Amino acid sequence: MNPSQILENLKKELNENEYENYLSNLKFNEKQSKADLLVFNAPNELMAKFIQTKYGKKIAHFYEVQSGNKAIINIQAQSTKQSNKSTKIDIAHIQAQSTILNPSFTFESFVVGDSNKYAYGACKAIAHKDKLGKLYNPIFVYGPTGLGKTHLLQAVGNASLEMGKKVIYATSENFINDFTSNLKNGSLDKFHEKYRNCDVLLIDDVQFLGKTDKIQEEFFFIFNEIKNNDGQIIMTSDNPPNMLKGITERLKSRFAHGIIADITPPQLDTKIAIIRKKCEFNDINLSNDIINYIATSLGDNIREIEGIIISLNAYATILGQEITLELAKSVMKDHIKEKKENITIDDILSLVCKEFNIKPSDVKSNKKTQNIVTARRIVIYLARTLTALTMPQLANYFEMKDHTAISHNVKKITEMIENDTSLKAKIEELKNKILIKSQS
């Protein structure tokens, strides 16, 4: 089968805008291709990178199904200057809109769990259904750093670009610097044209707009004009609108006028799914015990977790050895130690007692009341998981006879967790609260 025909056949699998904007610009490079390597030329580096990331595997799979042969797909930038003139899509327009957008940040690569499904659902709905934009406008996504807010924001951007929409993505810092630069150059008209004449405006870390009243005034008018023109606005922040410091009341009111969706730290099963997805994307193979170790040993910052995965792969590649659990522990030991130094057993005891509405002195006593025993075991379990305290040190803290009593409590609570999903969820929630507090 002619590889060029593969792209034509793929047209049936994609929407018209998606095909016309991207795959229709590819040209099969017969000279550089081989039996097991198919090379396609894209108009420029930006397009090549985007298409390789988003469609490379899909093209390879489609080729195998249609021809019965396997081949690696390589999308590269066409070297001739003439290529930019022949493309059906305005490349300069795309670069101006989406240079900052990460093509790997898509809805397909986002791992959905209980902690983020509302935010995910809202963003995906407006990205694919224009009518919902009028109802869900603006969308305000908030939560701690590193949990996927930027991923969702850029997923909306990438999906909107595929539909031929004009997208502007900017962090608050980008927005402020853009305004300041145009103000100094006497070119505010250029600034206004850029931000007001878009279909979709994506603002990351909107909480940092509160630096000056002038910046907020500019954003207020831009916000109103986009919304009045039926444009879509999505923002992210670390806190909900009513808790934003330095932001004017009229802006807070605008932010809260649509959907407010929070993203919370993921539960263990979602963390494991995220790690698997990151491994798949980076083509890294990790065993289940290593994945579980990473998930239970690190906090919930997804960028941090991905950094560890890439570091593990780098160590293994450079040293020429397999990624083992021992290697993982060695690579992660300083990182885990740093985390644990920020968490004390007193912090854990205080939070657990507050959750169970009991006194710390009761937990540290010999009382055998069921809720006190359970709380005590949870404190011990979390202390073993989140701190560097040894069993003898914990035995001393609880004034127990020796460390075997601590070991017994750890064994009991572990069995309880395995058989009680609600208890497992509660402990995971407590763990996340402690980790968030330690990082603040």
Curated annotation (Swiss-Prot):
- Highest classification ranks of the organism: Bacteria, Pseudomonadati, Campylobacterota, Epsilonproteobacteria, Campylobacterales
Q: Name one Pfam family in it.
A: Bac_DnaA
Superkingdom? Bacteria
Keyword annotations for this protein, in alphabetical order, are: ATP-binding, Cytoplasm, DNA replication, DNA-binding, Lipid-binding, Nucleotide-binding
* Predominant localisation class: cytoplasm
Q: Which InterPro entries match?
A: AAA+_ATPase, Chromosome_initiator_DnaA, Chromosome_initiator_DnaA-like, Chromosome_initiator_DnaA_CS, DnaA_C, DnaA_dom, DnaA_N_dom, DnaA_N_sf
| Subcellular localization(s) per the UniProt record | Cytoplasm
In this chain, the stretch annotated as Domain III, AAA+ region covers: 100-316
**According to its record, what is known about the domains?**
Domain I is involved in oligomerization and binding regulators, domain II is flexibile and of varying length in different bacteria, domain III forms the AAA+ region, while domain IV binds dsDNA.
> Could you tell me which residues belong to the region Domain II?
74-99
A biological process from GO = regulation of DNA replication
Which molecular function terms from Gene Ontology are attached? ATP binding; ATP hydrolysis activity; DNA replication origin binding; lipid binding
> Which CDD domains does the entry link to?
AAA, Bac_DnaA_C
Q: Give the quaternary structure.
A: Oligomerizes as a right-handed, spiral filament on DNA at oriC.
The protein's job, in short, is: Plays an essential role in the initiation and regulation of chromosomal replication. ATP-DnaA binds to the origin of replication (oriC) to initiate formation of the DNA replication initiation complex once per cell cycle. Binds the DnaA box (a 9 base pair repeat at the origin) and separates the double-stranded (ds)DNA. Forms a right-handed helical filament on oriC DNA; dsDNA binds to the exterior of the filament while single-stranded (ss)DNA is stabiized in the filament's interior.
Entry annotated with the keyword Protease: no
Listed name of the protein: Chromosomal replication initiator protein DnaA
- Span list, region Domain I, interacts with DnaA modulators: 1-74
Span list, region Domain IV, binds dsDNA: 317-440
Look up the record and report any one GO term of the cellular component aspect: plasma membrane
